Amino acid sequence: MKRILLIAVLLGTMITATTYFVCIAAPSVLFGKGIKGSGNIVTRTIDAPDFDRVDAARAVKVVITGKATGKITIEADDNIMEYVVVEAKGGRLTATIDKSVNNVSNADVTVTVPANGRIRALDASSAARITSEVTLTADKFSIDASSAARIDAAVKSTSCTVAASSASNIDAAIETGSCTVGASSASKITLKGSADKCSINMSSAAKLSAAEFTVADCSVDTSSAAKATVNCTGKLRAE
């Protein structure tokens, strides 16, 4: 009986020690690594896959260029390059930093993408930025920025949706038939161009500057300290 009791006590000690060790190691496993950009920029080139949507996240800058190279150029700090993810799935081209890296500071990551004539949506989040150097054309187009991201683009479409949230910023020149605009949580949208019809919904200290965006038929709904400046040449409904 004494021998059995001794084994039980030792086993209990081993379990306690193992549990303590896991608790110490867990933060690096759960929260990943942090990397500071070296400042030494290197370049990598890959073949451009088929895509019709561009998504950028985690402070990555994406530039859409009119150069028909068929290639995507990635510029990044040499100690961050291996963690830059540029891939296409289901027509969605994503440029971001690998999830294994929890925090990136002083990084400079720019992904240059050729305009392939099929892009119909731009989505930027988490302090990322998308800039189009050419006018993008599609039947239906979507622009969405969130979490301090920024999008600068020119679009021609039959219909267009523009959405900004969480302190993001959109600056767009748009020529469209029908447009839906929405912003919240201190986001800002600046529009130029024209639309036949436009529906606008602004809330929570968001701001729309559209004095240079002429609309024939416009409805505007603002709430919670939001502001909207519009240029309506015909019917205007405001709440």
Each language-model region and where it sits:
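Intrinsically disordered, low-complexity terminal regions
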Residues: M1-E239
